[in-house]
Amino acid sequence: MSERAPVVTIDGPSGAGKGTISQLLAQHLGWQLLDSGAIYRVLALAAIHHNVELENEESITLLAAHLDVKFLTGNDTDPVQVILEGEDVTTDIRTQECSNAASKVAAFPRVREALLRRQRAFKTAPGLIADGRDMGTVVFPSAPAKLYLTASAEERAQRRYNQLQDKGFDVNIERLLSEIIERDDRDMNRPVAPLVPAEDALIIDTSGKGIDEVLALALNFINQKLSDTN
């Protein structure tokens, strides 16, 4: 069944709207969803749950190969639920402990290779929306429809600022902007799987655009690409 399941990849920098659009597309199409950005955090949490030493590459690799994780979409306003071994860990994977552990396990080449295969296993009928940074270039290079969402650093900083303000955090927008620019430079110039649009991706600049407008652009492109492959 997986061979016949189409994949839509959605790549781009943080704050460009990938998560929101990916969730809405998965809901609209009734497809599976892969949030690749959460995968390493989920693996780290699984290691903590199973008392696996984070420095043990062999054990972490084995855990990665059999990682039991699902991403569930609710309604438009609910965040994507991350399910690890049947348990909702959506909040748990966002802790600082989990973040630190994720950085450790991500450093192992064999772990990265195992998770690459695990991510590809998400390709099941009726289809997959793959949200990440290298979905269209590395993980699913043969996907029939590839999107690359971007926005100005200033707009992404403002979006992040608004999110944190809504949660009651006191933040400095200039610092957020500086961090975004630094991360962009790091991601786009890293030697392995740099953050770049796939050659055949539709690039959508979400600056100044509403969610409905971006969703319509994405759906029109996806429908066109899928009709071309049938």
UniProtKB/Swiss-Prot annotation:
The keyword Metal-binding does not apply. One of its GO terms (cellular component) is cytosol. Its EC number is 2.7.4.25. It is found in: Cytoplasm. InterPro entries: Cytidylate_kin (IPR003136), Cytidylate_kinase_dom (IPR011994), P-loop_NTPase (IPR027417). One of its GO terms (biological process) is nucleobase-containing small molecule interconversion. This is Cytidylate kinase.
